[in-house]
């Protein structure tokens, strides 16, 4: 997981901290905030970056564990730390969202990239025709291309086809809107808007990609998606990490199918 976290920027850590924060349990909000501030004051420091990454990993692994199990592993000094592994966290997210994991062995970065692409594919397929149309048009596709595409593909939306038809930039806009809309569903639209506004100053392409459709999507997904308390944190964290890994265009142009689970509702 460290290879994944070391690719993040200060703004990413701040976003994750907002999701992680909790008034209960073993989370260390104060320590996490202090580590982010220390890294922000000296972003070239390898030691400060690694210390922050280690703390974030610990928090995420804790969130994927039950309090009782975490405490028992903590007092028994379990090798590798008391939390479940990051891969276990993401595997549980795949299961909760009813998405199929990739069959081939892959890195943590590739795993969360696949998660985001499969999630986007499933969610867009579930949208009503008119919402799909708005989403695709907001990604920069012409009305003519959108009409042609949806006429035959509204139930079979696939990112590789979008990349072929409209280019990588359009695919990135679609994924960004869907993922940020989903994160807003879990942490609240007001909080998500505030955090995204901050992120847009660091990553202008995200600011350009996000439109009103992202917040419309937030309202379309039902309470089913909210899952339990832990999943309300591990799902948006995993999706956000996947979005970060795709920021430089690492899309799988072959496929990222949601799998045989079908409609996740």
Please tell me what each predicted stretch does.
Residues 124-213, 227:
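Compositionally biased, low-complexity segments of secreted and virulence-associated proteins
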